[in-house]
């Protein structure tokens, strides 16, 4: 039996149905890798952020997410190099899809009960997305802006519905806008911690505030 078309499971018609002790025998997700490229790059190395954002409420199957991941990664490796970007899948397929298998042979009505007891058995997984929710994100250098936009444009063709490509005003994968981050970094108020960072706030003891400023200046 072939795989049922994705259009059968596209819309969010009911509440989520995750794996639990009541929902056993769920197949493994087709997507297992959610971060690709140079994952351990520092915050300052990749200041540009490009997002693929959903314009609909819908289900995205794990197979579609895996296809989009492969497509975007392949394009970025070819046009930017494997060490010049960090690709991240922003959703996870928690929702379990069900199927009520029906026979289509002669005399099928004698062998099955039709729509009686039609709850179905676990069949696959999908991620539930809503309006303006990021699906994929790429942080990279400013010189590879066009490559990142094109990679996500190709990846969104693997999804149903409508998506848009957004060049974000955030600084990389941080939660701060680029202007604010650069201003704090120039004033020595940012402590870099590899792929993350801390902001030195004007609170707490004066001694700790001075120590943090000195640590940020030396690093």
Curated annotation (Swiss-Prot):
Record keyword Zinc present: no
Keyword DNA damage part of the UniProt annotation: no
GO molecular function: structural constituent of ribosome
A Pfam family hit: Ribosomal_L16
NCBIfam families tied to this protein: PRK04199.1-4, uL16_euk_arch
Subunit: Component of the small ribosomal subunit. Mature ribosomes consist of a small (40S) and a large (60S) subunit. The 40S subunit contains about 33 different proteins and 1 molecule of RNA (18S). The 60S subunit contains about 49 different proteins and 3 molecules of RNA (25S, 5.8S and 5S).
Name used for this protein in its record: Large ribosomal subunit protein uL16
């Amino acid at each position: 039996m072939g795989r049922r078309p994705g259009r059968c499971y596209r819309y969010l018609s009911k509440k989520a149905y995750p794996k639990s002790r009541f929902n056993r025998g769920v197949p493994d997700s087709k997507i297992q890798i959610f971060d690709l490229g140079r994952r351990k790059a520092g915050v300052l190395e990749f200041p540009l952020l490009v997002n693929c954002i959903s314009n609909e409420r819908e289900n995205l199957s794990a197979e579609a997410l895996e296809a989009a991941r492969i497509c975007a990664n392949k394009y970025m490796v070819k046009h930017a190099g494997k060490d010049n970007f960090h690709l991240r899948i922003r959703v996870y397929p928690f929702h379990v899809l069900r199927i009520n298998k029906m026979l289509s042979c002669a005399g099928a009505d004698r062998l099955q009960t039709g729509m009686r007891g039609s709850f179905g058995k676990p069949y696959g997984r999908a991620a539930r997305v809503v309006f303006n929710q990021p699906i994929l994100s790429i942080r990279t250098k400013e010189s590879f802006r066009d490559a990142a936009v094109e990679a996500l444009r190709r990846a969104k063709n693997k999804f149903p519905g409508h998506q848009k490509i957004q060049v974000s005003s955030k600084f990389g994968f941080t939660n701060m806008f680029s202007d604010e981050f650069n201003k704090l970094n120039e004033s020595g108020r940012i402590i870099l911690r590899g792929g993350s960072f801390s902001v030195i706030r004007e609170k707490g003891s004066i001694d700790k505030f001075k120590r943090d400023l000195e640590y940020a200046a030396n690093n």
